[in-house]
A protein has these predicted regions:
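A polyanion-binding, active-site-adjacent surface
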Residues: 2-196
Length: 200
């Protein structure tokens, strides 16, 4: 089958040319995502930040450094779409608000999410990163706070894992909730090794 006939590539081409939200994106349109029909791990984030908007590389920032450390993966594995898919709730940088980046645009999920999720039949683990991703992917089990949802991570394990956003802005949260890095991160790393070693 030619690349042009590949449903994943066809859909990615459409997504990357989407400008539906252009009037609401002060820095312009630049959808950032990666996936393959063979992806085994799915990372569901919020939306690209300013640096990622500039480079077009998902999690190419301090948040990504921490996320890769939590997962215990190399850059080579992280950016290999055959292994890891990255599908933020919003594909474009939404701009800055008074207290950080604005929330992801809701249009992305409405327009593309179900179609894209259907193109990844081999996902064994979904990392659900931050409150916006949790609200969509764990809507039935979302607790009153992100902390409460993450504390009940075993209820979704080993196929899904809600985690806080790895942004440096969450350093205080991580200090207050040391159990995350002592209990959850080692389990995550073991699961990632198990999945990737099976399919390497």
């Amino acid at each position: 089958m030619k690349t042009g006939d590949n449903p994943v590539q066809q859909t990615l081409k459409k997504v990357r040319s989407c400008d539906y939200c252009r009037d609401h994106l002060p820095h312009g349109v630049r959808p950032v995502l990666q996936l393959s029909a063979n992806s085994k791990i799915l990372i569901v984030g919020q939306a690209p930040g300013s640096k990622v908007h500039e480079t077009g590389i998902p999690f190419d920032d301090p948040s990504g450094d921490r996320l890769r450390a939590w997962m215990g993966v190399t850059n080579a594995d992280f950016y290999n779409a055959e292994k890891i898919a990255i599908l933020p709730m919003g594909f474009c940088y939404p701009g800055r608000g008074k207290s950080g980046d604005l929330p992801p645009r809701e249009e992305c999920a409405k327009l593309w999410r179900h179609e894209l999720m259907g193109l990844m039949p081999s996902i064994e683990l979904t990392l659900i990163v931050g409150q916006y991703a949790i609200a969509w992917h764990l809507s039935h089990a979302k607790q009153d706070t992100l902390t409460a949802t993450v504390k009940r991570w075993r209820e979704h394990w080993p196929n899904k894992l809600p985690i806080p956003h790895p942004s440096p802005r969450n350093n205080i949260w991580l200090k207050k909730n040391a159990w995350f890095e002592t209990d959850v991160v080692p389990a995550l790393q073991q699961r990632v090794v198990s999945i990737l070693s099976t399919h390497s």
